[in-house]
């Protein structure tokens, strides 16, 4: 049990390579995916890479990258095999020099001799000659358009249109030989933009922006298209998940406008290790997968690459049956800009909404009893000798305790939320607030003069309910979903509030049952991250029905806010 704007389909046409393309005839200003309410993968052309395909009807592929010295053949082969045995479908190997690129032949020979046929990808930076060697050996090469034909000088200058055109012609001369080699040898290519390594030319004209990232890739993509070469995968990586998500969305929007359909490789640069790396990757990659964007995934952790594969697999496997979700009402007009971050306008209720950072609400409702020790996992340490609370940087702001009561003095920064009937017997206690169902809230039940938490799902949101919320300066919504496509349903609810100009603050609530620790981290990050990236939440509430891991839930809640750059706690 997991409790707590769409548009019609596109017309399609074909280009000269015979692939189905999205028509720009119906393209809306926000459009970057088939639907914001119905799960559907964005259709891309199938690109052949060795014995597997990416895009089209192929499943979402998972891949990783070796960390060994490419000249250490034995170590690279051994690590590659470990990755493949862990489920890695493409193995990327760095080739920083021509010598490294040449050694890919021996690495490939030994991997094939061991009985493994996973395609190899050469990762190229700065060295066109290495790329041209590698393209004759491996099944795919990755180039970074920010440094393939440019050296970073950090020059600040204004380019005239003529000077810019000269720069593009210089790039064409450097890049075209690789394109022709790839075309001749049947080698695929990833044009992979990195937010941190845009060329001086791009930075001076477009800035360090998603628009600059997209244009950086398009400069190289246009050259490929001029050569009638289409075995291309694109990526827009960044360590900032807001920038990463916006860049991929803008990339798809621009491709739709052009009638292009190249598959996408998803990843967050240098996500980190442990829980933080998993949260950051899930928030960024998950935000795109939720909207049907992405044909291959690499989760970049500072761990051995074989440990990245189960994380990537766990992310993509959530979408195997997603198309069967319950219907969600479509949206006539999308009230947000998906290509930039702007927080939804909400009124201030205590320290929730408006200018305040999103709050974290703990769930203690399933505990047998609540004592001082119950708050330890949620960032509060009680010192018996000093008879005082010590508050950490990751201390929850509110705790939902259900039908329970508290018989000790709570920390000065903590608010307590109780079910309404229980609160009525405790309403004299400081910083104790009621939790309402829609029925009780609209039925005239007694309210707190400052803060009233009201539970809602999308089907609850009728005109009478919205009108009541608009007129109540003390109301805060705790939103939930019972839909398998839950993030989209909660986004639809938030769009409705924006459209109806209802400024009630919203705490995003999700509940999880008996799932593993890793699944809890990945699922909650994927479910809540996209909403926070779009500025749509004023708080988070993770209900772990399994119980017994409150410290993990607390770290995850704060980690999601940190990863989405909405609240810094470390």
Q: Model features per residue range: what roles?
A:
Residues 2-8:
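Extreme N-terminal basic, low-complexity initiation segments
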Residues 23-65, 70, 179-185, 321-375, ...:
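N-terminal amphipathic alpha-helix/helix-capping segment at the start of soluble metabolic enzymes
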Residues 35-36, 41, 73, 84, ...:
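Active-site beta->alpha loop and helix N-cap motifs at the rims of alpha/beta catalytic domains
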Residues 48, 53, 61-64, 92-94, ...:
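Structured core elements
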Residues 48-63, 68-87, 91, 97-100:
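N-terminal glycine-rich anion-binding loops that anchor highly charged ligand groups
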Residues 54, 59-60, 67-69, 148, ...:
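Short, glycine-/Ser/Thr-/acidic-enriched flexible segments
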């Amino acid at each position: 049990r997991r409790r707590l704007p769409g548009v019609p389909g596109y017309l399609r046409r074909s280009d000269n390579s015979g692939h189905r393309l999205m028509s720009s005839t119906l393209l809306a200003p926000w459009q970057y995916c088939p639907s914001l309410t119905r799960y559907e993968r964005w259709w891309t052309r199938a690109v052949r890479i060795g014995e597997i395909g990416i895009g089209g009807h192929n499943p979402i592929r998972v891949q990783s990258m070796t960390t060994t010295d490419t000249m250490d053949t034995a170590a690279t082969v051994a690590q590659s095999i470990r990755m493949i045995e862990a489920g890695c479908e493409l193995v990327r190997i760095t080739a920083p020099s021509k010598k490294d690129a040449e050694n890919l032949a021996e690495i490939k020979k030994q991997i094939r001799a061991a009985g493994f046929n996973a395609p190899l990808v050469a990762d190229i930076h700065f060295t066109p000659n290495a790329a041209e060697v590698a393209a004759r050996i491996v099944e795919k090469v990755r180039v970074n358009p920010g440094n393939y034909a440019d050296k970073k000088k950090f020059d600040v200058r204004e380019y005239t249109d003529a000077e810019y055109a000269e720069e593009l012609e210089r790039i064409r001369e450097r890049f075209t030989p690789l394109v022709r080699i790839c075309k001749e040898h049947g080698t695929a290519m990833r044009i992979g933009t990195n937010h941190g390594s845009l060329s001086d030319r791009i930075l001076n004209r477009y800035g360090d922006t998603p628009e600059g990232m997209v244009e950086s890739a398009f400069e190289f993509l246009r050259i490929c298209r001029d050569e009638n070469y289409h075995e291309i995968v694109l990526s827009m990586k960044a360590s900032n998940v807001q920038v990463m998500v916006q860049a991929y969305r803008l990339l798809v929007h621009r491709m739709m406008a052009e009638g292009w359909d190249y598959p996408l490789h998803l990843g967050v640069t240098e996500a980190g290790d442990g829980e933080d790396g998993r949260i950051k990757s899930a928030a960024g990659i998950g935000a795109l997968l939720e909207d049907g964007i992405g044909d291959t995934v690499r989760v970049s952790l500072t761990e051995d690459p074989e440990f990245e594969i189960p994380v990537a697999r766990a992310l993509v496997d959530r979408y195997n049956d997603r198309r069967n979700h319950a219907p969600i009402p479509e949206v006539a007009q999308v009230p947000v800009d998906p290509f930039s971050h702007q927080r939804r306008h909400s009124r201030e209720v205590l320290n929730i909404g408006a200018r305040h950072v999103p709050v974290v609400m703990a769930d203690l409702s399933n505990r047998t009893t609540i004592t001082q020790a119950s708050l330890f996992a949620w960032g509060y340490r009680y010192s018996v000798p000093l008879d005082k609370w010590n508050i950490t940087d990751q201390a929850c702001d509110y705790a939902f305790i259900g039908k329970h009561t508290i018989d000790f003095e709570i920390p000065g920064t903590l608010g307590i939320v109780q079910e309404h009937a229980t609160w009525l017997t405790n309403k004299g206690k400081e910083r104790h607030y009621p939790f309402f169902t829609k029925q009780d809230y609209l039925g005239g039940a007694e309210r707190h003069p400052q803060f009233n938490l009201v539970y809602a799902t999308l089907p609850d949101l009728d005109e009478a309910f919205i009108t009541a919320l608009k007129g109540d300066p003390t109301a805060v919504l705790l939103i939930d979903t019972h839909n398998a496509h839950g993030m989209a349903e909660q986004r639809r609810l938030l769009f409705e509030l924006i459209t109806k100009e209802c400024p009630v603050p919203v705490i995003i609530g999700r509940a999880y049952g008996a799932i593993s620790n890793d699944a809890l981290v990945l699922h909650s990050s994927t479910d809540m991250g996209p909403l926070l990236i779009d500025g749509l939440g004023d708080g988070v509430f993770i209900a772990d029905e399994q119980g017994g891991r409150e410290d993990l839930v607390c770290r995850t809640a704060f980690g999601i806010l940190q990863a989405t750059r909405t609240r810094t706690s470390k």
